[in-house]
Amino acid sequence: MLGSTHGTFTTDLRARVVACGEQPDRTVVHGVAAVEGDTDVSGRPLHAPVPDLDRFFRPEVVAVVGASDTEGRPNTGITRQLLDWAGRVGARVVPVHPTRTAVFGIPCVPSVAGLDGSVDLAVLLVADPLPVIEELAASKVRFAVAFASGFAETGEAGARAQERLAAAVARSGLRLLGPNTNLNAFERFREDLEGPAVALITQSGHQGRPVFTLQELGVRLSHWAPTGNEADLETADFISYFAHRPEVGAIACYVEGLKDGRSFLLAADQAARNRVPVVAVKVGRTEAGARTAASHTGKLTGADRVVDAAMRQFGVIRVDGLDQLQDTAALLARARPPVADGVVVYSISGGTGAHFSDLATAAGLSLPTLSEAKQDELHQWIPDYLSVANPVDNGGHPVGDWRGRKIIDAILDDPAVGVLICPITGPFPPMSDRLAQDLVDAAERTDKLICVVWGSPVGTEEAYRTTLLGSSRVATFRTFGNCIGAVKAYLDHHRFTTGYRSPFDEAPRTPSPSLRKARALMRPGHRLSEHAAKQLLRAYGIRVPREQLVTSAAAAVRAAGLVGYPVVMKASGPRLAHKTELGLVKVGLTSASQIRDAYRELTDIARYEGIDLDGVLVCQMVGRGVEMVVGVTHDALFGPTVTVGLGGVLVEVLNDAAVRVPPFGEHEARAMLGELRGRALLDGVRGAPPADVDALVEVVLRVQRMALELDGDLAELDINPLMVLPRGQGAVALDALAVCREGAAS
């Protein structure tokens, strides 16, 4: 707990840490006992069971409802693909058709009622899956897939139809994929590829196709879950399941909208505990993208700033393009944990090395200068006039003979080096073929990551197609940008998971004594006055200035004597949001006459503007510091969110803020400050003393507790400015705005 005497609860969200290098057991949620009904103080779940989807992906018996072998009908092509897939996974197919005796020579049953209870998976090739779902429940079928469209993606009527379908599924006890999905779960997965696999989750089948083609580049794929509208099974279910599969090295997701924010975070938490990378394209960065995504699946896209922060908070690697999704997931799936974060660029061309180094440094990668001893060693094989400090320029000729392997081994032998990147911008077989083979051979002998960027636009060269893509130990890229992004994600994810502490482990489960005081202040559907909002802050141990609310000039003079000169006077009322712009704040008042004049002027302005006041605040003047803003808003997907940023009258102009989704701990609160462009102001600039960052962090954590406990009551909170005083002097909320939700619990 941070050292404060304010408040009645701890802000410490300690969690158990997996020892560095320890490999979590993927058969259970690592470190978590899933407890039925275990919720945080806001009523949201803290644990989610891992769904058992083994019989979905590897069923023994598959029923195809609406199977057909009549040429020209859509169901015929689907039935044919299902038969092919079933043959490869060893499943028996039972066609269901009311009038046919056989389909493709396989005996039919006339209805779902005729199934014998051994069916694991039912594929529904029918326009309306609802009546079939109800029949499947009686036959004890465990899983179903509904391809039909016309549900939430079509508007209100479709959304109501999907609600009825979801309710029927919930009653039945089976699990449903879809509706509005496709055949991607039943694709042909190659069994001849080595190494850990990429598991794929998409809400659009076409968008997953580029990642599926990783198999043509030598990368193994294990599963594809096309979730569609997610009436039942959702993206989070598949993340949880894949995070516990031993063959899965990384999870690649294409997400248009999320069904439930908390379930997504719980799934991402399980992946982080098990150190399984999750890489995601999340549509909706722009208004047009969000609108299109919502209409495609009928799900909320969420405020993009919040989605971005939530993903980063739980280690989900967000990328923008499908090519980035493909390359990043492939690298993360197959790379061993880094032994160091130093990156060396090794190239045939000095220009290529310089260009790549600029891009890598700009991305935040560490390119250490090799030691003098290491440079002397490299100059045994590389001419002295070439630079080998990093990047290492070999000039071309050494790679064509025995020296090439010596150079690579010497670089990898440096303990500061964890990644070697070799950009080969164009094929020149006497050099590039030998270089590619030397890199592949070196990758088999080292635990360090070796990456190659093959720059030829042709892509049919033997060194590329056979040598590089034939190796599961070398990460091969086609562009500089994708290589740099993937390597950064690789190093960042390792750092994240090595120090990961799940915030769910120590999230508050029971209300603090502050809640009773706070609820007494709530006014459902109304904005609180500044005075009432500050009382709310005081209930949670957040320091506010000494102040009194008065309704006469004489009372204001008496209050100033009690508060202590100099004072600030402010109009107070529930409809006041921007007092400064209206001239409703007077500062630096030092005498009774100034107090009386200020009172008269404030009330006159309010009367002229038609603003109802509950009085005038006479407030203690607080010393100078760094003005910050700390606030709470409610996101449709994730619930309460906490924001911290640079504050004051220019808060909207500066737009320098970081956001998090509760629960989070002290480490995450400090990370929020590190994201601010103006972070240096807290360290002291131009002679100003360093600010009390510890006090600021504690305010953020106390506001988070308030946001969780008052989730059903508080729609919005804005502390602006929060004056962060010099180190050791604390932080004071000089102004506050609070808006109560309609139908609040109070």
Predicted feature descriptions by range:
Residues 17-20, 27-746:
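Catalytic-core regions of core metabolic enzymes
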